[in-house]
């Protein structure tokens, strides 16, 4: 077995490249359930996308490596769309169109076997300690009133999670995928862009709504909900923006 190379790190798991595979190693035995659920979710998405132009790394095994629960899948070589955007800003419009086409293709898949995005958001909002019970009630009431769909939602769709190489287009990091409303997933992507690449956020939302025929106001109705769901991560640098979005529920 060759030496492993760190690719990414988080509070919950680290991702390594080893022997041509990407290995996600969870940091504590308490994450056994997260590991198994992420593997099941990935496998279901992998099966669903088999006839799509979107490719997904093949999952090979779930195991315990050095006492850590791990998921092993193909390591995909290539550049992320984020890298391509950074290196070729003159082609930003082309990449943004491609980005939206990929997301639209994801939303075209129906996933009745995945857990529901609404259920996940409900749990996240109920567990928040940073907002009062009245605000929670307003958010949960809004969430309950939103149309219920069973479309495939990535949950963390961003340019860094798309890899492009000579074989095609790969989308990675499916652990947060759920069945739900596509506009909730779009609102989530818009939020991620506002936090990490704000100059791209508005062009993305405008172009997505134009290409898909979706009302911008309909996507924006999800913003307080996705902001509340993000708040549970407890990132201090995000709190001001998220609380501002959550407060919109009072008068929207």
What would you call each of these model-derived segments?
Residues 90-118:
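Internal "kinase-insert"/substrate-recognition segments embedded within catalytic cores
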Residues 170-173:
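Pre-DFG segment of protein kinase catalytic domains
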Residues 188-252:
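Helix-rich C-terminal or lid/interface subdomains of diverse kinases
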Residues 81-90:
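AlphaC helix of the protein kinase catalytic domain
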Residues 66-80:
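Conserved short submotifs of the Hanks-type protein kinase catalytic core
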